[in-house]
Amino acid sequence: MSWLSNIDKKQLALHVFFICLVGVVSAFTSIVLCICVNTSYRLNQEYSWLVFLLPVLGIATLAFYKAMKLSYFYSTDDMVMEMRENKPVSPTLAPAILVGTCLSTLGGGAVGKESSAFQMGASIGETLSRAFKLKNVFKNKQDRNVYGYAALMGMSATFSALFFAPLGAVFLVFELTHFKTFSPARFIALLVSAFIAASIAYPFGIGDIIPRVAIPGVTPDLMLQVVLIGTLGGILGRFFGASLAAVRAWERKRLNHPYLSVLVVGIGITILVVAFGLQSFEGGGMNLLKQAASGSIGTWDFAIKAGLVFLALGSGFKGGEIMPTLVIGGLLGCSLGQLIDVDPAFATAIGVMTFFAGMTRCPIAAFFLGFEVFGVEIIPFLAVSLIFAYGASHDSGYYGKGIRLNFHSARRRQRLAKQFIENAGGVDSALAKLEEQANEFATEKEQAARKEARGGAQASDPTAKPPNDAASHS
């Protein structure tokens, strides 16, 4: 077959070895990250006075980023934007985010490690691809770089090693990049690498294993309650993500002294934690998620956690936002469950995924991640809640715009068409205006083609004089 002859066998062998190597390296990367961050968290909880060092540790983190020649403001959302544009990722990002996350956690910053694993995975995946001199498997496409492919593989593998959810990890990285680099072959490659990473990491007992919950039977009343939790989770998740993104965008444009921001906010976080006894809200928050599953939380605990996460990540402390997002969603779901008489553990599970979908604008990844974490029994509830979570929230979150599903696109087209007709003064006027614009476009296209033809003629005969338009029209 012709497509077989187009395959570069050497590159194919390199790709197979690369897939396995990324899986292995990503697994041990996640293991190292977990050991370091978990140690920092244990020290913070054992020696509560470390919270007073949070401002100093934040400044030290920014100094380390400067030494690594990275932007003070660089975070996961910046990396996602680079992935969407197929730009390379700095190899120094892996050690920088590892050190930054550990220092933030040591001082009591409300940050996680999953997004840090994303950044480390992207950096490692791309660095390995350069060492392999990796190119496209197909000979006629070897002029295209593979930065995005290699980085996505590292991202999905490291995330899978933390959550032991290969499908959710792969769909998350593709969804974050709007499926721009998606192909069946790449999907399989990323999935194999993610499975390898999860299989290696699992026996070590690392990662954040969200406890499974009992899933009730499907009833009309329960479905309505799930719709309510999903809708509110999506709306509040989107609001949280967009607010955090807006603050970070403002900092990039307006903030000239990032050290001052970390110092002032770090002092503020320290005062809040000490004054109100919020030590349990420090770090990623897995302890809070376990409490939510048992129903032993306060009604407004989700708001407290969201506030501390917003202050830490919004001011420039380094760390992940994914685990805190899941925790906030779980706390919100548990609170809503208590209000509407739904099992707290089940409500926590629905809240986790719907808030995550609203914040990231990744409903497909939330669906697969949800049933991998909570089991296939949750699928009908998950599907319904995520549809309402995505539909109720605006098409923008922490990572910018999400994928455009049909109902979003159709609704936007309908709104634009209605506005166009109203501005034109009716359907007939709108059609006439469209015809006029089409004629203008055709004329402009014809003039551009004529100009290009003249340019080509002059290029082929430099001595030729440009034609006289007036003479040609006479």
Regions found by a protein language model. Give the residues of each.
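Alpha-helical transmembrane segments and immediately membrane-proximal extracytoplasmic
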Residues: M1-S474
